[in-house]
Amino acid sequence: MGREFVEIFDKWVESYDASVSGQDPEYRDVFEKYDEILSAVTNKSLGAVVEFGTGTGNLTAKLLEAGHSVIGIEPNDAMRQVTAKRFPDLVLIDGDLLDFETPQKVETFVSTYVFHHLKDSEKEKALSTYASILPVGGKIVFADTVFTSEEAKQAQISKERARGFNNVADDLEREYYTTIPVLTHAFEKAGFDVQFEQMNDFVWLMDATKK
C-alpha cells in the first residue's frame, strides 16, 4: 500500500535536498526543473490542501507561501521529523496514499514524486477514495515520473543502464511507474477530468478535476 519503500528514505533523508537540487548527476534529469514542478503543482491547487509525501517540506513551503492551509501526510519517521522541525505549526500525520485521515474539508490532494509507490490497482483505489472526499470541482494535482507507453519506459531503463545510471534504472524496475493511458483510465473511472503536462524527460504533471 505504498509503505514497502519507506525504508529507502531513511537512507535518502540526509541527501534528498542535494539530489533534487541537481547535485547528484545520476538523478539530475529526474529532478530537472524541480522548482518549476513544485510551483506548477502549487499554482493549480485550490483551497485546503492535503499533501502526500511531504518529504523534507519543499512543496509544503510553496503551498504555505501561496496561502493554502496544508495537512501533511508522510509515512517516513525521519522525513516527518525534518518537516516538523521546518514547520512547527504544520499538521503532520503518519499516513500514506491509501491510509490517512483528513481532519478538515479538503479541496485539493497534491503530491510530487510519490504516486508510483502504489501498484496500478492501488492507484485506482486511491483515486476512488479521493473522489469520495472531494467536492465537485475539487482537484488532484500530482507530479510524478510517468511514461507515454510501456515501450517508452523500457527504452528509458535501457538508456539509464547505458549511461551507467543503475540506481535510476533499478528504481524504474522496482517501483510501480505507469503510463499515461493507464492513469487516464484510472482518473476517468474515478470521476475526474484529467490533463497531463510534461515537465521534464521523466515527470508529468497530472491536473485532475472532479466532475
Region annotations inferred by a language model:
Residues 113-117:
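Short catalytic micro-motifs in class I SAM-dependent methyltransferases
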Residues 143-190, 196-197:
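C-terminal alpha-helical "lid/dimerization" subdomain adjacent to the S-adenosyl-L-methionine
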Residues 110:
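A conserved beta-strand element that flanks and buttresses the S-adenosyl-L-methionine
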Residues 124-136:
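A short glycine-rich, Lys/Arg-flanked "PGG" loop and its adjoining helix->strand segment in the class I
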Residues 190-211:
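Core SAM-dependent methyltransferase catalytic element
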Residues 52, 56-99:
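Class I SAM-dependent methyltransferase SAM/SAH-binding core
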Residues 1-44:
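Conserved class I S-adenosyl-L-methionine
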Residues 48, 69, 139, 193:
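Residues at the starts of beta-strands that form the adenosine-phosphate
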